[in-house]
């Protein structure tokens, strides 16, 4: 019996303020709103690109994302090149987003892959990275992937 090929579908995130989160994810990731319900008790938004659903936002939580609890560690998005990472970094700085490290950093010592690490308005840890082009700067963590310890 062969195992069918799997790929990640969409990722669902709980948020505290749907309108704020929709604006953030649209500006940072250039997502389109595929469908949304912004009134009533069941508020949500389905976000994607070119008809492909990528992230769902559910307004059904309070407080901030708890990084010390089991669950999502971080959500990562790959872009084609490091120039796209720098463009995202510029948008993040314009929005006043919290950057975990100063600018684009490699995933590890000697790695050419790397990106920008940041949090959304609810403290959910996010990453935008390129598979190459980030190797000139020193890695911010030693002996482990940068993306694992932020």
Q: Language-model segments: which ranges?
A:
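Short coil/turn motifs at secondary-structure junctions
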Residues: 62, 80, 131-133
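Core segments of cupin and vicinal oxygen chelate
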Residues: 13-55, 59
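Residue-level structural signal for beta-strand termini and adjacent loop
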Residues: 39, 59-60, 105, 131
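Vicinal oxygen chelate
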Residues: 2-4, 7-17, 45, 66-150
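Short, solvent-exposed loop/turn elements at beta->coil junctions and helix N-caps
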Residues: 43, 62-63, 103-108
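Short beta-strand/turn micro-motifs at beta-sheet edges
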Residues: 1, 60-65
């Amino acid at each position: 019996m062969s195992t069918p090929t799997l790929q990640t579908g969409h990722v669902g995130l709980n948020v505290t303020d749907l309108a704020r989160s929709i604006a953030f994810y649209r500006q940072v990731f250039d997502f389109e709103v595929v469908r949304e319900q912004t009134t009533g008790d069941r508020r949500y938004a389905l976000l994607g690109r070119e008809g492909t659903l990528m992230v769902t936002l559910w307004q059904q939580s309070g407080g901030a994302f708890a990084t010390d609890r089991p669950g999502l560690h971080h959500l990562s998005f790959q872009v084609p090149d490091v120039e796209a990472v720098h463009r995202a970094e510029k948008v993040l700085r314009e929005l006043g987003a919290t950057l975990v490290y100063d600018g684009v950093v490699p995933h590890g010592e000697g790695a050419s892959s790397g990106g920008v690490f940041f949090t959304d308005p609810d403290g959910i840890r996010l990453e935008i990275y390129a598979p190459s082009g980030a190797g000139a700067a020193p890695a911010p963590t030693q002996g482990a992937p940068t993306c694992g310890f932020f």
